[in-house]
């Protein structure tokens, strides 16, 4: 009878173990998929935060430039027809606006090549006309004349200021006549500070594929090779996750175009693998516990339901002993 108990218990336990293992595998698969999708969505959301930061930065400075243009255009035409009148009437407006947004430079380039310049580096003086800057050869001047909208330069190194700036320029017309080209120089450091405060390991490439803004300032080091990220992005496109190797470490990333820039977010593959492995570890422990409990319970359940068979076996043995004259007593079943 003990042999039957063991065999039945073993069969029942093997079936239960198989079912629990299958259940565990299926559960792990769906858990892994859920964690993977959740993590990727979280990283995508963080990338969108950086994208929105860049867009808001651009929108704010464009609104500033339009407001400045409007105030200049609203001046009487007599205030804009001579250099002296422009200095006296436009100069204070340029200085006021520069202070309001803490710009590096705010200026008005005239048709004769001169520029009325308000500088942060020379704040004590009122804006003055200069003719030594060769403004007509500058992109901000030429491109603004080609469009009716605001032209925005990519971040570039200003040779005079010795720092990276972003220029917003707009051609100004009054009564159908060109007054000049308005320019506003914003330090790219302002954008860097905004990006630095965004969550996640995000950064911005300029048109030359150099990082100029990042949450991790170590990435601004020009000696770092970022080609693995750029190459993976080229193969996968905007907002598509990719994997790449960096210093023998597997990493995940996603990038998207934001105007002239490329915004990216990257993380170690561990950010996905760790919670998956943790979930797998917990499920394995739970599976072992469930199998152990199942084995014990099934053994006792089988033993309980087979106990009447033991009485029947005893009764039958006694009966056959009686009819074979081996005993004079018969046990009741």
What are these regions (language model features)?
Residues 2-41:
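Extreme N-terminal signal-anchor transmembrane helix of membrane signaling/transducer proteins, especially
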Residues 9, 13, 204, 264-320:
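Cytoplasm-proximal transmembrane signaling helix
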Residues 41-49, 53-149:
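Extracytoplasmic/periplasmic sensory segments of membrane signal-transduction proteins
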Residues 84-100, 177, 181-219:
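Solvent-exposed, extracytoplasmic
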Residues 99-100, 111, 117-185, 191-194, ...:
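Extracytoplasmic/periplasmic ligand-binding sensor regions of membrane-associated signaling proteins
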Residues 110, 140-173, 199-203, 207-208, ...:
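Membrane-proximal, non-catalytic sensory/regulatory domains of signal-transducing membrane proteins
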Residues 168, 180-187, 252-279:
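Short, hydrophobic beta-strand elements of compact beta-sandwich sensory domains
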Residues 324-333:
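HAMP-domain connector/hinge
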């Amino acid at each position: 009878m003990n042999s039957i108990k063991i065999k039945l218990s073993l069969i029942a336990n093997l079936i239960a173990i198989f079912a629990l293992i299958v259940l565990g595998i299926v559960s792990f698969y769906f858990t892994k998929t859920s964690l993977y999708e959740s993590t990727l969505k979280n990283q995508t959301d963080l990338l969108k935060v950086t994208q929105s930061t860049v867009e808001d930065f651009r929108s704010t400075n464009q609104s500033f430039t339009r407001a400045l243009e409007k105030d200049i255009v609203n001046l009487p035409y007599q205030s804009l027809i001579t250099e002296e009148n422009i200095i006296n009437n436009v100069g204070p407006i340029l200085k006021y606006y520069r202070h309001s947004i803490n710009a590096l430079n705010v200026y008005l380039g005239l048709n004769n090549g001169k520029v009325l310049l308000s500088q942060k580096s020379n704040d004590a003086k009122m804006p003055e006309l200069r003719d030594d800057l060769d403004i007509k050869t500058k992109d901000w001047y030429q491109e603004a004349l080609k469009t009716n909208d605001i032209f925005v330069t990519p971040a570039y190194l200003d040779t005079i200021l010795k720092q990276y700036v972003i220029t917003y320029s707009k051609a100004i017309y009054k009564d159908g006549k060109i007054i000049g080209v308005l320019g506003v120089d914003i330090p790219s450091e302002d954008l860097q500070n905004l990006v630095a405060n965004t969550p996640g390991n995000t950064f911005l490439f300029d048109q030359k594929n150099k990082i100029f803004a990042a949450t991790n300032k170590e990435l601004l080091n020009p000696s770092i090779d970022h080609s693995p990220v750029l190459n993976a992005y080229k193969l996968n496109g905007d907002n598509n996750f990719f994997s790449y190797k960096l210093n023998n470490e597997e990493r995940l990333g996603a990038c998207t175009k934001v105007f002239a820039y490329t915004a990216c977010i990257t993380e170690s593959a561990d950010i996905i693998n760790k919670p998956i492995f943790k979930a797998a570890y917990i499920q394995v422990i739970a599976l072992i516990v469930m199998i152990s409990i199942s084995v014990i319970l099934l053994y006792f359940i089988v033993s309980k339901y087979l106990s009447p068979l033991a009485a029947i076996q005893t009764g039958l043995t006694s009966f056959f002993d009686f009819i074979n004259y081996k005993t004079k007593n018969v046990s009741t079943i």
